[in-house]
Amino acid sequence: MNLVGSYAHHHHHHHSHPPHPMLHEPFLFGPASRCHQERPYFQSWLLSPADAAPDFPAGGPPPTTAVAAAAYGPDARPSQSPGRLEALGSRLPKRKGSGPKKERRRTESINSAFAELRECIPNVPADTKLSKIKTLRLATSYIAYLMDVLAKDAQAGDPEAFKAELKKTDGGRESKRKRELPQQPESFPPASGPGEKRIKGRTGWPQQVWALELNQ
C-alpha cells in the first residue's frame, strides 16, 4: 500500500517526469518471469508433436504410403509378381517339348516304312536283321529284276529265283546275277507258250532268262 500511495503522491507533484520504472516492476516483470518459467512447459506441449514427427514434404504421402512405395518401387506391378513369373517359366519347357515329339513321330514313320519294304523283298530269312542301307539296296536290286522281266516279256517263274544278296560285294549287276544262278535248273517249271496262262504270284527268274544272261 505504501507503493501505491507513493506512486500517487509522486505522480501528483511531478507531472513532467515519467514514472519511475521501479514502480511498475511488480506488474511488468512479475508476469514475464512467470511466463518465462512456464514457457518450457508450453513449448514442450505445443512443439513436441511436431518435433517427434519425421519431416515429410508438404503434400506428400502419409508414412504408410511412403514405406510401401519404397518397398515395392515405382515400377512394381501386379503382373511382375513372383508367382506370375514362375507360371510363365513353367510354360517354356512345354513349348520345347513339342520338338522331340515331332521328331519321334517322324522316326517311327520312317521305321514303319522300312519294315513294310523289307516284307516286299522275297527270300530274306526271317531271323535276318537288315539295316536301312541293305534294305534299300535289296529293294533296288529286286526292282531292277522285275523291270528286266517286264522288258523281256518273260513268263512269271518261281520267286525263289531271286535271292537276297546279304553280303557286301564290289561287283556290278551282272556279277550278282551270275552268283544268283540256281544250282538245280530242273526245279524251275518249263517255259510256257505264248497262249498259255501265266502263273500268278511274285515273278521269278526263269531258266531261259538265266541262259540268255550267261550266253551274253
Curated annotation (Swiss-Prot):
<dbReference type="GO" id="GO:0001221">
    <property type="term" value="F:transcription coregulator binding"/>
</dbReference>
<dbReference type="GO" id="GO:0000122">
    <property type="term" value="P:negative regulation of transcription by RNA polymerase II"/>
</dbReference>
<keyword id="KW-0539">Nucleus</keyword>
<dbReference type="GO" id="GO:0030154">
    <property type="term" value="P:cell differentiation"/>
</dbReference>
<dbReference type="GO" id="GO:0003218">
    <property type="term" value="P:cardiac left ventricle formation"/>
</dbReference>
<dbReference type="GO" id="GO:0001228">
    <property type="term" value="F:DNA-binding transcription activator activity, RNA polymerase II-specific"/>
</dbReference>
<feature type="compositionally biased region" description="Low complexity">
    <location>
        <begin position="65"/>
        <end position="78"/>
    </location>
</feature>
<dbReference type="GO" id="GO:0001701">
    <property type="term" value="P:in utero embryonic development"/>
</dbReference>
<keyword id="KW-0238">DNA-binding</keyword>
<dbReference type="GO" id="GO:0003007">
    <property type="term" value="P:heart morphogenesis"/>
</dbReference>
<dbReference type="GO" id="GO:0043425">
    <property type="term" value="F:bHLH transcription factor binding"/>
</dbReference>
<dbReference type="GO" id="GO:0060485">
    <property type="term" value="P:mesenchyme development"/>
</dbReference>
<dbReference type="GO" id="GO:0035050">
    <property type="term" value="P:embryonic heart tube development"/>
</dbReference>
<dbReference type="GO" id="GO:0001829">
    <property type="term" value="P:trophectodermal cell differentiation"/>
</dbReference>
<dbReference type="GO" id="GO:0005737">
    <property type="term" value="C:cytoplasm"/>
</dbReference>
<feature type="region of interest" description="Disordered">
    <location>
        <begin position="165"/>
        <end position="203"/>
    </location>
</feature>
<keyword id="KW-0805">Transcription regulation</keyword>
<keyword id="KW-0010">Activator</keyword>
<dbReference type="InterPro" id="IPR036638">
    <property type="entry name" value="HLH_DNA-bd_sf"/>
</dbReference>
<feature type="region of interest" description="Disordered">
    <location>
        <begin position="1"/>
        <end position="20"/>
    </location>
</feature>
<keyword id="KW-0804">Transcription</keyword>
<protein>
    <recommendedName>
        <fullName>Heart- and neural crest derivatives-expressed protein 1</fullName>
    </recommendedName>
</protein>
<dbReference type="GO" id="GO:0060411">
    <property type="term" value="P:cardiac septum morphogenesis"/>
</dbReference>
<dbReference type="GO" id="GO:0001947">
    <property type="term" value="P:heart looping"/>
</dbReference>
<feature type="compositionally biased region" description="Basic and acidic residues">
    <location>
        <begin position="165"/>
        <end position="174"/>
    </location>
</feature>
<dbReference type="InterPro" id="IPR011598">
    <property type="entry name" value="bHLH_dom"/>
</dbReference>
<dbReference type="GO" id="GO:0061629">
    <property type="term" value="F:RNA polymerase II-specific DNA-binding transcription factor binding"/>
</dbReference>
<dbReference type="GO" id="GO:0043565">
    <property type="term" value="F:sequence-specific DNA binding"/>
</dbReference>
<keyword id="KW-0597">Phosphoprotein</keyword>
<dbReference type="GO" id="GO:0060707">
    <property type="term" value="P:trophoblast giant cell differentiation"/>
</dbReference>
<keyword id="KW-0217">Developmental protein</keyword>
<dbReference type="GO" id="GO:0007507">
    <property type="term" value="P:heart development"/>
</dbReference>
<feature type="compositionally biased region" description="Basic residues">
    <location>
        <begin position="92"/>
        <end position="104"/>
    </location>
</feature>
<comment type="function">
    <text>Transcription factor that plays an essential role in both trophoblast giant cell differentiation and in cardiac morphogenesis. Binds the DNA sequence 5'-NRTCTG-3' (non-canonical E-box). Acts as a transcriptional repressor of SOX15. In the adult, could be required for ongoing expression of cardiac-specific genes.</text>
</comment>
<dbReference type="Pfam" id="PF00010">
    <property type="entry name" value="HLH"/>
</dbReference>
<dbReference type="InterPro" id="IPR050283">
    <property type="entry name" value="E-box_TF_Regulators"/>
</dbReference>
<dbReference type="GO" id="GO:0090575">
    <property type="term" value="C:RNA polymerase II transcription regulator complex"/>
</dbReference>
<dbReference type="GO" id="GO:0060536">
    <property type="term" value="P:cartilage morphogenesis"/>
</dbReference>
<dbReference type="GO" id="GO:0001525">
    <property type="term" value="P:angiogenesis"/>
</dbReference>
<dbReference type="GO" id="GO:0019899">
    <property type="term" value="F:enzyme binding"/>
</dbReference>
<feature type="domain" description="bHLH">
    <location>
        <begin position="94"/>
        <end position="146"/>
    </location>
</feature>
<dbReference type="GO" id="GO:0045944">
    <property type="term" value="P:positive regulation of transcription by RNA polymerase II"/>
</dbReference>
